Structures are given as structure tokens and as C-alpha cells.
Amino acid sequence: MILQRALWATVFFLVFSPDAMSQIRPPNYDESLVPKFGLPHVLEGPDGKRIASPEAWPGQREYLLTILATQEYGIAPREPVDVTLEKIDDGDYASGDGVDQSIRRRQYAVTLARNGRSVRIDLLVWSPRAPAKQVGCFLGLNFRGNQSTSDDPNVRITTSWCDARHPGVVNNRATEASRGSQEERWPIRAIVGSGYAVATAHYGDIDPDYDDGFENGVHALFPEFRCSIEHPDRWGTIATWAWGLSRLADALEQIEHIDAARLMVVGHSRLGKTALWAGANDVRFKLVVSNNSGCGGAALSKRCYGESVAAINRSFPHWFNRNFRAYNDAEETMPFDQHQLIAAIAPRPVYIASASLDRWADPRGELLSGHHASPAYELFGKEGLAATSLPEVNRSIGGSIGYHLREGEHDLLSYDWQQFIAFARKHGL
């Protein structure tokens, strides 16, 4: 018993001490220094046996999700909340180029309520003005508030927490100066002109992006269900944002012109990690898009290239659950990796987008994650991602697992959206 207590004390110190969080190795950008590593096969269960039929997939998928939830993202509450939708604006798209009557702007207040507490999320939806039938919808969170995604003066300025480093943000609150500051990431005309709707909400409406001990945002709806030393497997902020995306899917199902059978989730960077986790858990998302999601997203952690587990846990200790810290500078001990996250989306299509200059996100690690997830798709007779070497820039490859390496930096640009739209069409969405 004394030995067991001593061992537990040692593990506790290694995982949770400030020194352990600060003493991390520098990033590796040399392929020759990538360690040799093994990956668990995506069809291999806890008994070491591989499933061989689509009928066995639901159980295997649940096994993968359980590993990822308990060891990385955190377990989210399963208790439902009341989701109500109130339309607060309905008009035409207005921009510096004038009013575009072919694009309809609608803004909704989505209220999540439980046990006398409530949280409001502002949902912005752009769609064709007069579609002949219900339309498919891309759903994604934004970083700076809905007003940052368009220069339309009618879009409400977010009142929730914003990162003070962003332009037009004062004392962690958005101002008019932030309007349209990220409209290049949301090419509304191109998306709606392709026949789709696009919906977005500010990630800060769901949970503010700082280490607050899980007190704010939708965590306030579940005060008894916080990640802590006593409960290290509970939801971190990425799992919280993903849970919020599912609640927004609940809301979109209530909008008459949205085809609830054609919901697609998309995200960039940390919100790409979020989109993957949301898509893996919620089968209502018929297509999942990860853009430059990197460590904790599409990139294989065991490659130890670019951002490491230790680096991400040190910089963003709230993103993942506390158990994930056990793998700081110890990726070789991980009994899982991100290819299992991609596989958990099967047989639904998933698209992984990288950028050529985004070494921090490890483009090759993102590609290889898709490659090693492919057996889950092949189980259903679908093509996955055969490539193990990066393709030439600005070329889309793959089957039900799509991939491209866009030329340029860590960003979400019109080229990326062009590929996402083409991929959606390819898969009949």
C-alpha cells in the first residue's frame, strides 16, 4: 500500500506540477528526427482482434471514441438541455458593394437552458434568398464574433469574451472596428452562390478561450460536471465547443429552409480540432472538415513534429482534459493517436486541409492520419486516403478522406472553401 501511494504521488507530480508543464522539449522540424513509432490499427479492439465487417463497426467506433474522450478531449455531459430558437433578424446581405438580394441573412438567439440556468448563443445564417428546396448547410465557429465574418452592418456585434490580441477588441470585448476583420475566411457569396447555406457562431458564446477553471460559458449549466483533479477525464474546452456545435445542429434542425440531412461541420486551427471531435461524436454531421487543425486535431502526435502535446498543454491547459497531460513529452506511451479520431467519423466523408508553410501543424502528420484511418472506410467499400507523401501544393486528393496542401500560411482562404464545396458535391451533399 505504501508503494502504491508513492507511485501515485509520483504520477500526480509528473502530470500536474507546474515544472512538468514548463520543461518541454523544443519543436522538431526535421523529418530525420521523427522517431520510429507504432500506431494502433483503427479496426483493432481492446481484445487485440480486428473487426472484419460493417456490422461490427458501431462497437469499434464507440471504443475509439471512449479512448479519445477519457484520455484527451474529456467526457461531455449526456444529460440534455432545452434548446430554443428565436429569430431576431431577417434581411438581405448588405456590404460595401451594396445590397445583394440573392443572399438572405438571418440571425437567431439560441438559448440553452438547464435547471434554471441559461446561456445564449448568437447564430448567423446566410442562405440563398429563394431556394427551390431545402439546402445543405456548412456550420462552423468563428474566432472574433459574427460581425467579424462580414462587413454587413446589420450583423450583431458579439457581447461575449474576445481575445484581446485581435484587432477591434478592447478589454476583451469586440467593437465596431472588428466588423469584417475575418471576412476572407467566410466567402459568403461563393458558398451561397454554390447553393449552400453557411451558419456561424462565436466560439466565445459557448466557452471563453482561457483557463477559467471551467466556470463560464456552458460549463455554468453543469456546475457538477467540471474537469478537475478528482475528475481528470471530464470535458475540456475543445469538447465543450464541440458539444456547442451539436446544440447548434439542434437549432438548425428547426430552421425550415435548412436540410437537416445535409449538415456539414467545418473549422480552422483549434476550431478544426473542434470540428473533428464534433463530427466524430455527432453523426448528424454528414461531412467533416478540418483546416490546419494540427496537434490534437488531424496531426499524428507520435511523430513529435511541430507542436507537441507538452507545448499545447502548456499554452492551452484548458483545451483538453487533465489526463492528456500524462503524455507531455511522452507521446510514445500514448495508447491512441489522431488517426483514430479520423476513423471514428467513418463511413461519413472527412476532409483534411493543410498549408505548405504551416510546419507547426505538421502537414505530413495530418496526411498520415488520414492514411492510417483508411481501413475504417475500406471496411465499407469506400476509398480512404492512399497517399503517404505530401502531394504538390494546391491539388486535392483522396476518396472519402480528402486532402490538400494549400500553398501558404496557417489560414482559411477561398481556395480551401472551393475544395470543401467540391468535396461536398462529390459526395452528394
Task: List the predicted regions and their residue ranges.
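Cap/lid segment of the alpha/beta-hydrolase catalytic domain
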Residues: 137-254, 260, 297-303
